[in-house]
C-alpha cells in the first residue's frame, strides 16, 4: 500500500509539470530575438497549440523531455513571435524518437529525456542554429538561463506571444529533494536543481523540454517542478544533459541500441 501511495504521488507530481506544458518562464522578460536560435517549439498537429520546448543540437536532431512525447506533433524552428512569423522559420516532424527506456518509464529523477531525429535536416539561418552539447558538467552556484513560451503567471492562464527568458541559479540537488519528502526522491540523481530560493523566477507549464543554459553551456532539460510555479524554496528539476552524452552521441552515430547510464 505504501508503494502504491508513493507511485500515485509521483504520478501526480509528474502530471503537475506536464500540465504546465503550456506555461512560460515566470519572472522573466522577452528574450532577445537573437539569443534563442536553437530553441524549438513543439506543436500539437491538430490543435496547433504549443505544448513543449526543445533544443536543436545539430541540423537533424532535437533534444527534449520524454514527458513531452505525443502521437502527432510538429517542430517549429526559427520562431520568436507566434503571431508574426520570421521569414526563415522551418517546420519538421519527427522521423525517429529515442528514449532511455520508453516514454512511459521515465521517473521524476531519472531518464526524462527524448532525442528526436527530424524528417529532414534544417539549414542554419538568421534565427536557426544548433546549440552544442556541454564539454564539462555544471557547478553549483552557476548562473543559468531558462527560456520558453510557457505561462507567465504562476496561477493564471496567461501566455505570451514571444518567448521569455530569465536567469536562475544552479542549486544543490538536496534543495529539490527536501521540499517533497512524500515522494521519496533518491539521495542522488541524474537531474539538476535550479531556481531562485526566494521564488519569483521559474520555468512553468509549456516550458517543459526547453534548455537550461549554465555559463553558456547546454546543461539541462526542463523536467518537473511545483504547481503553482516559482514558489519560495521550491526550485525545479532539469534532466542532466552531461550525464547522457554517451547515449546521445551513440544514437546520433547510428548505434540505436545504445543504453542510458544506469
UniProtKB/Swiss-Prot annotation:
Q: Which residues constitute the catalytic centre?
A: 67, 112, 208
- Glycosylation positions? 105
Query: Which first-to-last residue range defines the signal peptide?
Result: 1-18
Does the record carry Mitochondrion as a key word?
A: no
- Documented activity regulation: Strongly inhibited by PMSF, and moderately by benzamidine and soybean trypsin inhibitor.
Q: Look up the EC number in the record and give it.
A: 3.4.21.-
CDD domains linked to this entry: Tryp_SPc (cd00190)
**PTM annotation, UniProt:** N-glycosylated.
* PROSITE patterns assigned to the protein according to its UniProt record, in alphabetical order: TRYPSIN_DOM, TRYPSIN_HIS, TRYPSIN_SER
Give TM segment ranges: none
Q: Which GO terms describe its cellular component?
A: extracellular region; secretory granule
Where in the cell is the protein located?
A: Secreted
Q: Which UniProt keywords apply?
A: Blood coagulation cascade activating toxin, Disulfide bond, Glycoprotein, Hemostasis impairing toxin, Hydrolase, Protease, Secreted, Serine protease, Signal, Toxin, Zymogen
| Occurrences of domain Peptidase S1 (ranges) | 25-253
Q: In which tissues is it expressed?
A: Expressed by the venom gland.
Disulfide partners: 31-165, 52-68, 100-260, 144-214, 176-193, 204-229
Could you tell me what this protein does?
A: Thrombin-like snake venom serine protease. Has a coagulant activity. Acts on alpha-chains of fibrinogen (FGA) generating fibrinopeptide A.
The Swiss-Prot or TrEMBL record describes its family as follows:
Belongs to the peptidase S1 family. Snake venom subfamily.
Q: What is this protein called?
A: Thrombin-like enzyme calobin-1
Organism annotation = Gloydius ussuriensis (Ussuri mamushi)
